[in-house]
Regions:
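Sec-dependent bacterial lipoprotein signal peptides
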Residues: 1-20
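Intrinsically disordered, low-complexity polar regions and short flexible loop motifs
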Residues: 22-430
Length: 430
């Protein structure tokens, strides 16, 4: 037999092997990766991967913008170091090492975190579906809002009579997979072990029969309320937005007791120096009802952004009672071991600009009556001294000693005065 004829079977086999390697569907010897970007601190992300014996960063997913999911990209199966970078930036945000990806598998990386808190979680997208009439659910808590409980109930059920489907999911972690009955539910998310601490209320969410679903809890701009996304296995993202904002009142006026309602919800009933607790109201343009010493004060509607946090400060000048809507940034500090602090000026009886110093170092200056400074990050620690002075004269107004500032906490020093008696109330906002 001629030698060329003996080569035909070998060439045919090689040709078939090469063609199988071109299969876009992730055939034998390949794995599939994709990236979800729900990281408010990073507008666009790239994903790189390299094997243990090759330290060259190879880009596999590019330009995944905030609140989107990429298509799957195909890699040879094996063990990889996976890296995340800002789009177009060479420095690496995070490396997850030694990830083993088997043949014919699918994996989703969920990137999350505010600026300085970038992280990721991995979802394996080849979970066996449950029986008919059942749904598998896994919760990912990427909201930076503490540990959370998740309830799925009928719409009329009180949380006092309900048990979480998934309880105590710590920030930056995912739960085990739970299997529950399929159907329509009301979704509610609360702080862990506190059914009164409502963070999200979705009137209706549908869990399909034999579905495998990831429920991703994400941050809002204020830092405490959360939103939800559903991501079916190998499917697309669906957002369940939070329609609420949180608001509280603060009293700087000395004209008498203040009663305040925002969007029909009572947020304050107190005298000068009082800072109320946060209450949830529907976001949008909301009416304000205000009485001072029993006399109604006209206040225009206030615009609240969904997921936002606010303080409505009442104060007085020569023109009478005034109000200021102040945005509250209750997001975490950008680095571990840090706290955030600001000063709010409600000194109606003095009407002077304020300077706040932490351990004798000024961090805010010239803060006018009815305003608040931006937050400043400081190291956490004990035995701090806080000094508030008149910016114009440097006269001391308040000194607080032996102050503890906790890591990952947010503080407001609210300044008020009753006559010539000045006081400063340090509030822990989160």
């Amino acid at each position: 037999m001629p030698s060329c004829l003996r080569l035909y079977p070998i060439l045919a086999a090689l040709s078939a092997l090469l063609l199988s390697g071109c299969d876009d569907g992730g055939g034998s010897g390949h794995t599939n990766l994709r990236l979800v970007n729900v990281s408010p601190g990073y507008d666009s992300l790239d994903l790189y991967a390299n094997t243990a014996d090759d330290d060259t960063d190879r880009q596999h997913v590019a330009g995944v913008t905030y609140q989107t999911v990429s298509s799957y990209t195909q890699l040879e199966s094996g063990t990889y170091n996976v890296k995340f970078k800002r789009s177009g930036v060479t420095s690496t945000l995070l490396t997850v090492s030694g990830r083993a990806f088997a043949d014919d598998t699918h994996h989703t990386f969920v990137a999350f975190g505010s600026a300085g808190h970038f992280a990721s979680l991995q979802i394996d997208d080849d979970v066996a579906p449950p029986d008919s009439g059942r749904t598998k659910v896994q919760v990912l808590n990427v909201a930076e809002a503490g540990s959370l409980d998740v309830y799925l109930t009928e719409s009329s059920v009180s949380l006092d009579d309900a048990t979480p489907v998934v309880a105590g999911v710590a920030a930056g972690t995912s739960s085990a997979v739970s299997t529950i009955d399929s159907g329509d539910y009301r979704l509610r998310v609360t702080g862990a072990s506190d059914s009164d601490d409502l963070r999200l209320d979705v009137p209706n969410i549908t869990l399909d029969s034999r579905q495998v679903l990831s429920l991703i809890l994400t941050a809002t701009q204020g830092g405490v309320l959360v939103e939800a996304w559903t991501l079916p296995q190998q499917g697309s993202l669906t957002k369940f937005a939070n329609t609420k904002a949180r608001i509280r009142g603060a009293v700087g006026t000395t004209a008498g007791p203040v009663v305040m309602r925002v969007g029909g919800v009572g947020v304050l009933n107190g005298a000068v120096g009082v800072v109320g607790n946060y209450a949830q109201v529907e976001a949008g343009s909301v009416p304000v009802t205000l009485t001072v010493n029993g006399v109604a004060v006209a206040v225009p509607n206030q615009t609240l952004v969904a997921g936002g946090e606010y303080t409505l400060l009442t104060w007085t000048n020569a023109s009478g009672t005034q109000t200021t809507l102040i945005g509250d940034d209750n997001r975490l500090p950008t680095a571990s071991g840090k706290a955030k602090i600001r000063v709010m000026n409600g000194l109606s009886s003095l009407d002077v600009p304020l300077t706040l110093a932490v351990n004798f170092s000024p961090i805010a200056e010239g803060i006018a009556l009815g305003q608040a400074s931006a937050f400043t990050e400081v190291d956490d620690g004990t035995d701090y001294q806080l000094d508030v002075t008149n910016t114009d004269t440097a006269a001391n107004l308040v000194t607080k000693t032996s102050v503890t500032l906790q890591s990952a906490a947010v503080y407001t020093l609210f300044m008020s005065a009753n006559g010539t008696t000045v006081s400063g109330t340090l509030r822990k906002d989160r």
